[in-house]
Curated annotation (Swiss-Prot):
It is an enzyme of class 2 (transferase). It is found in: Cytoplasm. Transfers and isomerizes the ribose moiety from AdoMet to the 7-aminomethyl group of 7-deazaguanine (preQ1-tRNA) to give epoxyqueuosine (oQ-tRNA). This is S-adenosylmethionine:tRNA ribosyltransferase-isomerase. GO terms for molecular function: S-adenosylmethionine:tRNA ribosyltransferase-isomerase activity. GO terms for biological process: queuosine biosynthetic process; tRNA wobble guanine modification. It holds the Pfam family Queuosine_synth. HAMAP family: QueA. Belongs to the QueA family. Pathway: tRNA modification; tRNA-queuosine biosynthesis. Keywords: Cytoplasm, Queuosine biosynthesis, S-adenosyl-L-methionine, Transferase. It comes from Pseudomonas syringae pv. tomato (strain ATCC BAA-871 / DC3000). The lineage of its organism: Bacteria, Pseudomonadati, Pseudomonadota, Gammaproteobacteria, Pseudomonadales. Monomer.
Amino acid sequence: MRVADFTFELPDSLIARHPLAERRSSRLLTLDGPTGALAHRQFTDLLEHLRSGDLMVFNNTRVIPARLFGQKASGGKLEILVERVLDSHRVLAHVRASKSPKPGSSILIDGGGEAEMVARHDALFELRFAEEVLPLLDRVGHMPLPPYIDRPDEGADRERYQTVYAQRAGAVAAPTAGLHFDQPLMEAIAAKGVETAFVTLHVGAGTFQPVRVEQIEDHHMHSEWLEVSQDVVDAVAACRARGGRVIAVGTTSVRSLESAARDGQLKPFSGDTDIFIYPGRPFHVVDALVTNFHLPESTLLMLVSAFAGYPETMAAYAAAIEHGYRFFSYGDAMFITRNPAPTAPQESAPEDHA
């Protein structure tokens, strides 16, 4: 299966660079999996597609202000993007500088703070901060907006590039399908008899990395930490028992649930995953999906194609472009019910790299 099969032309004007005034005011494109039928709605119309007894699974990761600016003790400027918090003082980070810092060298952080470069691990640098990492980031860090939002971060991004239910700090990118939900909508979902459960997947900067191979099967995903608790496993089992649907809010929720159901049975899981879901791979847990519009040739678009079917997904994206939907993190959303017999661009039998 070719990566090029997942390309499309997107007008620059459709890239959402700022959030709308209200979270819930986004548009919603619905895609019926069994028929491929599309409907153009508002995000609040999602309530009409939910049934009493359904279970919605959200990712409660919290985005940390992971971008820092500073300089080496020798004077050269640099930019740090924290990829993973290792403990209270140490992180793995991407460092952009004219010359990479050497082990043992000091880094002075703009706004106050100091770090030592401990070691290099392939493309990532292990840094040790003199003070606790999370309070330091809250004090002087910048929100790590995706590269396609080509503007400096603003104060409003601290609130809007964060879900209202975010709890567990550790992500360097938002689980963006969740950005459309405000507290009144969450309450309306509960009032309809829909249950909710929360997984955690700390989204890494690798989510924005392009696929650099020609054949999908040759791609290896970056690793991210996730946790699916026994409470989530029990909630899914109860949903199945009452005949409800498991609705994942975001591709990270899909990847969490499917990572914890490797053998077809959902079990508690805590640890790293590099699961890569693309057309031909079965889904063991998820029945419906809320998701944003994703980048061309991205692994997220491949996941959606695996769920909805390749021709149906590409037709939906063409319709979204024609109707002026806003794309990517601050953009509009889709509600997709699973295609029971999805087709791929060409025959392929993927291996599960999770």
